[in-house]
UniProtKB/Swiss-Prot annotation:
Organism: Nemopanthus mucronatus
Subcellular location: Plastid, Chloroplast
Residues holding substrate: X123
SUPFAM superfamilies noted in UniProt: RuBisCO, large subunit, small (N-terminal) domain
The protein's name: Ribulose bisphosphate carboxylase large chain
Length: 143
């Protein structure tokens, strides 16, 4: 085994839910008129806090799935990432929350509704941090 492989193997990688809250949960974020706003109904898995679940949705539907490469220093994560800016419990429902996520318009290909919807409601629905997920509302800014 090469020294580089040994180092990576000794550090290890934690399987399961990544902690997205530090980068993608931003309750102090003020939405912009140019943001695409989504409201998701989320039911987190046992042990997953609602803020982490909302942040995971924001991450996995924006930049959280991007592969790390040497050019990462050329692209600003803050410019493109989705942000879970508010979480509120659903009245009368146990373990259900509305997670509000803002996406910068620059994240998506100009003029492509398909690209936007694939990112926002694509593979995130199979995410294991959640028992259930549903897109409740979507606001697209005027062109």
């Amino acid at each position: 085994m090469s020294p580089q492989t040994e180092t990576k193997a000794s550090v290890g990688f934690k399987a399961g839910v990544k902690e997205y809250k530090l980068n993608y949960y931003t309750p102090d974020y003020d939405t912009k008129d140019t943001d695409i706003l989504a409201a998701f109904r989320v039911s987190p898995q046992p042990g997953v806090p609602p803020e982490e679940a909302g942040a995971a949705v924001a991450a996995e539907s924006s930049t959280g799935t991007w592969t790390t490469v040497w050019t990462d220093g050329l692209t600003s994560l803050d410019r493109y990432k989705g942000r879970c800016y508010q979480i509120e419990p659903v009245a009368g429902e146990e373990n259900q929350f509305i997670a509000y996520v803002a996406y910068p318009l620059d994240l998506f290909e100009e003029g492509s509704v398909t690209n936007m919807l694939t990112s926002i409601v694509g593979x995130v629905f199979g995410f294991k941090a959640l028992c259930a997920l549903r897109l409740e509302d979507l606001r697209i800014p005027p062109a």
